[in-house]
A protein has these predicted regions:
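Positively charged n-region of N-terminal signal peptides that target proteins for export
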Residues: 1-4
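Bacterial N-terminal signal peptides
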Residues: 7-15
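Extracytoplasmic copper-binding redox domains, predominantly the cupredoxin/blue-copper superfamily
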Residues: 19-245
Length: 245
């Protein structure tokens, strides 16, 4: 009997590290190849007294002084068989997009199906938020000053979907909707991390407004921005990657 207990205890001890090795973190940093374009100034044609005071520029490319490239989206297209249990709590968190100073904050966002999206309006003027989808029901809602709307999506989308303001035509943002948590968006430093991926070979989609990325640091990606990556247990740092203009 004692031998059986000892054997069972040893089995538990040896199983725990194996379970811990089923997951890996994927990290990378994106730079824009070549000289960064000068952001195009926005011509304000509506609510000029308020919107015209903010020095608005196009956010098609947000590039740091060292070429750091923001808003690169990397995500698994398919829902993996395994999802790390730590992500369960994130479904209860709200994702927020704000109409602020006649632009959207953030420019690119990610949400999971079943998660709440809150679109607010911090401005003293009204905004009309319009979103078009392939799989989900589109909407076109007026949001008064200091107001908000709440949306929940049922289906995943294959690409980030466009969001605009019908009143202020220069306003643009994108929203990626997936039925799993494995996506990342590069920050102002060009940095992106996707945590607790299942170990193994994965095919990611790489997207940078307005299209799929075709090349990373000289490596040609498959059609539709498909990028094959082997994720090993622990940390996987892809280093600094360059996307051509």
């Amino acid at each position: 009997m004692n031998k059986l207990l000892i054997f069972a205890a040893l089995a538990l001890l040896t199983a725990s590290p194996a379970m811990a090795q089923e997951w890996g973190n994927l990290k990378m940093k994106f730079l824009l190849g070549g000289k960064a374009p000068t952001p195009m100034k926005i011509v304000v044609t509506k609510d000029v007294d308020f919107c015209g005071r903010h020095g608005l520029v196009s956010e098609l490319r947000t590039v740091g002084k060292g070429g750091e490239l923001a808003n690169v989206v990397v995500y698994l297209q398919a829902n993996p068989a395994k999802i790390h249990p730590d992500y369960e709590a994130e479904l209860k968190k709200e994702v927020k997009i704000d109409n602020a100073k006649c632009r959207f904050e953030r420019h690119v966002s990610f949400i999971r199906t079943g998660q709440k999206l809150i679109i607010g309006n911090s401005d003293p003027i009204g905004h009309n938020t319009k979103a078009d989808f392939f799989e989900n029901t589109p909407f076109n809602d007026l949001i008064p000053s200091k107001g908000s709307i709440t949306k929940v999506f049922d289906k995943a989308e294959k690409t980030p979907s466009g969001i605009s303001c019908s009143i202020h035509p220069w306003m643009a943002a994108h929203l990626l909707i997936l039925d799993h948590p494995y996506a990342g968006i590069s920050n102002d430093k060009g940095e992106l991390e996707i945590k607790n991926l299942p170990v193994g070979k994965h095919t990611f989609t790489v997207w940078l407004e307005p299209r799929f990325v075709t090349q990373i640091t000289g490596q040609q990606l498959k059609r539709g921005g498909k990028w094959d990556v082997e994720v090993k247990a622990g940390n996987n740092d892809k280093g600094t990657l360059t996307i051509p203009q």
